[in-house]
Every structure is written in C-alpha cells, then in structure tokens.
Amino acid sequence: MKSTRKVVGIFLATCLLPFTVLQNVAAQGSCRNPNQKQGQCLSIYDCQSLLSVIQQSYVSPEDRTFLRNSQCLDGVGRQPYVCCTSDRSFGSQEATSAAPPPTTTSSSSRGQDGQAGLGNLLPSPPKCGPHSFSNKVYNGNDTAIDEFNWMALLEYVDNRGRRELSCGGSLINNRYVLTAAHCVIGAVETEVGHLTTVRLGEYDTSKDVDCIDDICNQPILQLGIEQATVHPQYDPANKNRIHDIALLRLDRPVVLNEYIQPVCLPLVSTRMAINTGELLVVSGWGRTTTARKSTIKQRLDLPVNDHDYCARKFATRNIHLISSQLCVGGEFYRDSCDGDSGGPLMRRGFDQAWYQEGVVSFGNRCGLEGWPGVYTRVADYMDWIVETIRP
C-alpha cells in the first residue's frame, strides 16, 4: 500500500499543482477558503479535512476544484499549503450554478461593473485569473504550458484564402474575447485579412498537441465570431489610437478546462492604482530577437512609465495621448511586438489572481530604448464592456 505522502504527492503532481488559484493570505497564516470561511494556512499533510478528500478512491471534479482553490501562501510545515478549515467541499451557495440572467441590460441592474444581475457575466476570483504552479519552463521568456490560459490568438483570411495568426486577445468570460480595435478594423483588413476565428488553449503554434515533459494540454479550440464590437469612438484613421479596444462575441459558449480560463477584469471592488515603476506582465506570440514571431507563448515583465513623460515623448511624433492610455516598457529589446497587438497587459492582485490592466495598442517601433509601448487602460472602459456584453 502506498504511503499517505506518496498518494498525496501523486495527486498534487498530476491534478493540483499546475492549475491552482491562490487564495488571499493575511499575516500569520490566516486565510479564507473558497467558501470564504476563515482558516489557517497549513501543510496539506496537517489538514485532516482536505487530506481525507485526497485519500478517497475517487475525487470528483468539484472536489478537485475546491482543493486547487484552497491553496495559500506562507503556510506552516511542508508544502503545498492549504487554507485549512473543517470544510471538505464547496458550500451549497458555491456549488449551485448561477441563476439565468434577467433580460434587462441597464447598468443599474448589474450593480457596480456588472457584479450583480445578468448572472454575473464577468467572473471574479477564484473563477478567473488562475495562477500557474507549473515549473516546466525551458527558456527565460517562455510561459509555462498552463500559464495565462486566457490568451487568445486571432486568425485572419486574406483575399487569396490564406490564413494567418496575427493579433492576440484575452478570454474574459465563456462567450467574449477582449482585444484591440485595430485588430478588427482599419489597416489590418487590407494588410492581413478578414478576422474569422479565435483560437483558445494554444501554447506552441508549431504543434498539434502541446507537451512539456509528461504534461500535455488539451486540444485547442477554434471558435467563430458571432459579432465584433469596436468601441464607438475608435477612429482607425486617427494615429493617436484613442479608444483602441474591441469585444469579440464567440459563436458558442466556451467549455472551460485547466488550459482555458478567463482573466479577471478590474471591477470596482478589485481595482488598484497603477503606479510608475510597477512591473506589469505582457504575454503573446509576437516578434522575438531571433524570429519574426515566436511559436511558443511568451511573457515579459515591463515597468509602468510616468504618463506625463510618455505623453511629452510621443508629442514629438505628433501623437497625443490621453489618460485612458498606459505607457509601459521602453527598455532596449524588451517590448510587446507586432503579433502581441490586442493581447493583455496584466498583474497579480492582492488575492493572487491575474487581472488585465491594459490592451496592447501601439508603439514607436519595437523594443526601442526610451520609447514605451502604449496600452489601452481597461479600467477606463469597464462601463462600456459591461454595457456591451450579454449572456
């Protein structure tokens, strides 16, 4: 018979660690579990309630999710740590699916940023922005196979029928992808082609099935676009690229799995200030120092620039920025490039979930010293997003 530690180790290695969402942890090991019950951050080996779940002959998908979402930081004893209470599974409120939405679309019916009414169309942690625990990363800028699993690739078809993956985007719920307006209308239509398809669950575009060692993801999803909605004030002829944001409604609901999850958006209750010098993360399949495009999903940590400095810099190119545009980066050969357009600019919240703060918009060449990239600030468009999405 296998020892308790071996059984737990096998379970964690195959089912838990790569796909975990961390819970918010306060000082001295206090935490809240997925049912929002206060507990202690302990080694799972010292938490009998959750250890007993793992030791069952069959662990249901719901219990696996509860275990994943129970992990915490800064615990006591041997890793991994869990927020330990007497709970063994989701409470009745968590286990019950959301009620069907009412038909009204007014912002008042949704509460702040759509958190009430309409079936809570924008998810909140732990149902968005999961953190990867996989350590299977071979190159410095490659992501883990399950990292940033809301990333989307946009596919275009030109007038000769040739297909090309160009822009990026991010899944924000099971029906919508957030991207840049310039990835939908304007020069992209003549230079790349007509936007036709969204690809989800991608890691390495050169392979049909993506594996790192013995970890393989599920097949990618190819979804059509039922409707593309560009911000009404976006003007593709305006080189300032103000309001460069768009929503893609997919032709069917996405069945979420460990490799396809939505990112969190900065709702009023979770919104944080963005400070100069703070490191944010951009991800995509854009140009690298050695190739026009990367086949493997990349990540890069970039500092936020002072907005006034950035605005003055771009004014010398007769480009005039407004407060809803973020400036990030500006380091030599460290930038979001080409194919990253429309992709997310992200950061970890206090609850350890990932939030999308920006959409890749434009820059003055790529990776040019002293020239930051410009991103559409998502928080400034939350009202528009909430008013646009529907069940």
Swiss-Prot record:
SMART domains: CLIP, Tryp_SPc
Pfam name, any one: CLIP
Keywords: Calcium, Disulfide bond, Glycoprotein, Hydrolase, Metal-binding, Protease, Secreted, Serine protease, Signal, Zymogen
Cellular component terms per the entry's GO annotation: extracellular region; extracellular space
Glycan attachment residues as annotated in the record: 141
Record note on domains: The clip domain consists of 35-55 residues which are 'knitted' together usually by 3 conserved disulfide bonds forming a clip-like compact structure.
Assembly and binders: Interacts with Spn27A.
PANTHER family from the UniProt entry: TRYPTASE-RELATED (PTHR24256)
Name of this chain's protein: Serine protease 7
Species this protein is from: Drosophila melanogaster (Fruit fly)
